[in-house]
Amino acid sequence: MMWRERAEVRIGISGMPGVGKTTLVLKVAELAAKKLRVCGFVTQEVRERGVRIGFDVVDIASGRRTPLARVGTGEPSVGKYVVFLGACSTISEALRGTCDLLIVDEIGAMEFKCPGFGSDLERAVYNSPKVLAVVHRNYTNLAESLGFEILWLTRDNWSTIYNQVVHRLGLA
């Protein structure tokens, strides 16, 4: 497939919950924004009184924040979270941005509840010269099929992986 040949760099960050995957991606995006056009989206936890109650998706280019999922019952759901399909348009628009570095946080079950996410992701990866994604540990094979090199993040190797990503993206 020709689309696999396009991107110069495709890095996927995976790991267990709470090791700093989103933090790493946000810090790289902040550094990259000094010299590159950055687009895409990040998924951020929403907490209430210290307890995680859900997730919001944030479009990096516009700053638009949209509820993605909350604890509750209903469909579609992922675990204890109900996914709000209204957030799908934010994700889709973020993946259609034109930029030098595409950020995707995350490639995971909630995002795949959005109709068209797979094809939007594939198109965005093809059209972006550099891609940095958070990849849920259950989706690493899929990401590898899109040409991603998967780096496994832990609390112990966070700084090493951060430096490796910065170097690979030409930001050092």
Curated annotation (Swiss-Prot):
Reactions listed under catalytic activity: a ribonucleoside 5'-triphosphate + H2O = a ribonucleoside 5'-diphosphate + phosphate + H(+)
EC numbers on record: 3.6.1.15
Keyword set, alphabetical order: ATP-binding, Hydrolase, Nucleotide-binding
Residues reported in the UniProt entry to bind ATP: 15-22, 101-108
Principal EC category: hydrolase
Coiled coil feature spans: none
Protein purpose: Has nucleotide phosphatase activity towards ATP, GTP, CTP, TTP and UTP. May hydrolyze nucleoside diphosphates with lower efficiency.
Family in the record: Belongs to the THEP1 NTPase family.
Name this protein carries in UniProt: Nucleoside-triphosphatase THEP1
Protein source organism: Pyrobaculum arsenaticum (strain DSM 13514 / JCM 11321 / PZ6)
